[in-house]
């Protein structure tokens, strides 16, 4: 069943900086405002953006998250063709093989993506609080004829070293990207939301997987490699409210 764009939602985070809040549950399952959990924001965004096929990649303490997501009916994602699918790490040979990084998590689930033969893959994080129309970002990605588009937000300078930081030219093309730099040159931060042309992403996940020196992370490995090889990466400026639930304070 061909899909124009599917989403892969990274919900495996242990959230060790959140201390006792996440002792027994994955960070995206942390309760927010009583009856919601943090992952609700991203799943609702998918539904409201017309993205009806979402793979949720879980690994740390996944049971609560699995039962919470269920078949996705809370977000109108209980579809016969697509819908929401929980994708825990599986091992072909022995024991459980943990996802080794954000890029490795997607790499291990390329078969899931292939069955939809998408033109584009939207990569999301399940531990952010924000409202966003991903369809607008996809339209922007297509209009810019980009290989990859990264959603960005201006953060306070004193917080910039917590994020992937990029410099862009006047056309919003990314010319430089540094993951958590000690001395940031810009305060334009990656929101951990990416759109890739699937054929390109597939190729670069395979290259990354074969690299013994890679930590298999989008921010540390895949994005810098795409830049080095002069792929067209553009930044999509987001103006709304966004919080990365990385620390108890936020």
Curated annotation (Swiss-Prot):
Its EC number is 2.7.7.27. It comes from the Bacteria. CDD domains: ADP_Glucose_PP. Coiled coil: none annotated. InterPro entries: ADP-Glc_PPase, ADP_Glu_pyroP_CS, NTP_transferase_dom, Nucleotide-diphossugar_trans. GO terms for molecular function: ATP binding; glucose-1-phosphate adenylyltransferase activity. Pathway: Glycan biosynthesis; glycogen biosynthesis. GO terms for biological process: glycogen biosynthetic process. It catalyses: alpha-D-glucose 1-phosphate + ATP + H(+) = ADP-alpha-D-glucose + diphosphate. Keywords: ATP-binding, Carbohydrate metabolism, Glycogen biosynthesis, Glycogen metabolism, Nucleotide-binding, Nucleotidyltransferase, Transferase. Gene3D superfamilies: Spore Coat Polysaccharide Biosynthesis Protein SpsA, Chain A. Pfam families: NTP_transferase. The keyword Transmembrane helix does not apply. Belongs to the bacterial/plant glucose-1-phosphate adenylyltransferase family. Catalyzes the synthesis of ADP-glucose, a sugar donor used in elongation reactions on alpha-glucans. This is Glucose-1-phosphate adenylyltransferase.
